[in-house]
Every structure is written in structure tokens, then in C-alpha cells.
Amino acid sequence: MRSVKVLATLLAVLTICGVPAGASASHLSYAPERPQSGWTVGATTARGVVTDYKMERVAGVWFRVFRLRARTALLRWHVGATDPPGAWHTVPSDAGPAVNWPNEGLAGVVGVFNGGFKVGAKAGGSMVDGLTLSPMVPGDMTIAIDAAGHWRMGVWGQSLPSRSFHPIALRQNLGPLVLGGRLTSAAYANIFSWGSPLNNQPSEPRSGLGVDAAGNLIYVATMSDIGPVTLGQALLAAGVRTGMELDMNPYWPILGGSFHPLHAPGPLPVQIPYSEHDPAIYFNGWQRDFFVGLAEPNSWTCSWVSPGLTTRGLVPQPLRAVGTGCPRS
């Protein structure tokens, strides 16, 4: 069974890289992930760029933009210590309220950033490692992550769930903000439907997440006071084709990006200007859910994978390297 999974993973890697599945891996060459004009390179590996970042000015507001490259990065989702309520004591350590250094550190952490609203806000459902923490809501925008750390974003009940994508984690947060490269009509509707602001003031610091035409994952955030329309415009300016709002209000938007894969706690210099928190809080445990970006192995013929949801119920999802040219554990 393991040999079948290894072969399937290698074929998937070859397909993603645009290589004929019948070609010999020893005779293949892979184009590195290259820098792009207008972006500053963050973390790199032998594969090329893993993350990059920039500041984007939209409607007079500066946004931090952080991008995970689809060919060189993978994604994980973690619960918080207090939200979702009780999840910390139920989920395995690979999805707990702190970066799981013994396992995720093998790959190398390249970025961390906040999740969505708390469960009490009734902004959507979530699932991790086979454990449903809140029921999925039809019509809500969903970020899905599979056993290889690949991501897909779509509206639940439309493009997700999908027979071709098998998630180990799901996170919803309200309806779609960007679809087909355009703001949705809901973005212009009642501003209070996009989150409960402090002191009834609808313009607040906000964060968002989206996927561009190349499949890259893009996080945007500002500590300036904005509404959902401006957040959506920032996602569009960053190249997002499908996007959603994440958490809001001054206390919750948090981002940290490294300049190289971290195998132990280290510097995260790429941050949201004027954020209220050092992103290193995710290293030791944080109260709310968050995402972790990791680096793929240096070899194009090796990938980090977890077991997947092969049975019903809770299934821990530790990473292991599969393929050829993999790092020694």
C-alpha cells in the first residue's frame, strides 16, 4: 500500500511541474520558482522562491501582502487554545495551538498567520484531522488543505467538496468576498454582515486570504480602519481570483514570515506594520486558530505528505517525506 501512495505522490509532483508522468525522474529538469517583479523574496530553498511579500496601497491604505508559492510551499491549519472551544484537548499535536516543531520543523516554517472568526460568531464550519469542530455551512467560502499540504479555495456546496480533492482540514469564514477575479455583490451589502466591529464602528483592521491564477496563496492585512470592500480591493490588487475575509479588529490580524525555513523557533521579520502581537506567539501557543506555511523538500522528486483520512474519525496527520532525494530524518 505504501508503494502505491509513493507512486501516486510522485506522479502528482510530475504533473504539477508539467512533466510527462512516464518520464524518468533521473533525467528530468525542473524550472525553479523564480522571483517576480514588484515582490520581495522572503524564504528560498533549492527549488527557488517559497514566499515573497510586498506592501500594496489601495484606497489610500497600506496593506501587507504575503504569498506562499504553490510549487514550493505547503499549508497546515491549527486550532487555538480557547477557540474552537475544547478543540485543544481533542485534536492531535499536529493541529494543536502551537507550531508542532518536532514534526513541522522537519519541513521548515516559512510563515504563520491568523485564521478566521471565533466559533461564537457563527461565521462557518471547520474540520481538522477528521474531527468536525463546527458543521460546514453551504454557501460559505472555504479553504481546504489536503494530505500533501496543497490548498484549494471555493464555495461550499459549489466547487467544494470535490471528488478530486481530499482534505484533511477545512476552514470557513463567511461568504465569498472575491469570485472570478471580482468583488461579490455581498461585499457592498450590510457592512455588519462582515463581522462584529468594536464599539459598533464598522471600519476596523481586517485580514483576508485568497488564491491567484497560478494557485499561489495570498494573505493580506492592514491595521488601518477599513471595510470589506477595501479588503476585497486589496485582494484583487494582489492578484487574487478567489478570496475570503479572515479575522478582524485590532487584536487579531497577525502575520510572520521568515527569510529561510525555520527548523526551530527563529526570526519572523515579515510582519503587518503596527500589529499588536509578535507572530512568535504561534511558536508556544495562541488562543485562536492559525495557519502555518512550510517549505517543500529541496528535491523536486520528494514531497512532504501526511496519512490522509483513510478511516472515519480522528486521524493524526504527521508529515513524512516521500519520494527520492528526500532529507534524512
Task: Tell where the protein language model's regions lie, with residue ranges.
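Positively charged n-region of N-terminal signal peptides that target proteins for export
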Residues: 1-6
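Bacterial N-terminal signal peptides
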Residues: 8-18
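C-terminal region of N-terminal signal peptides and the immediate post-cleavage residues
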Residues: 17-27
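Zymogen propeptides
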Residues: 25-135, 304-329
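Conserved hydrophobic/aromatic beta-strand scaffold that supports enzyme active sites
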Residues: 63-67, 142, 176, 208, ...
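Aspartyl protease catalytic domain
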Residues: 77-238, 309
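Extended C-terminal subregions enriched in glycine
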Residues: 178-180, 194-306
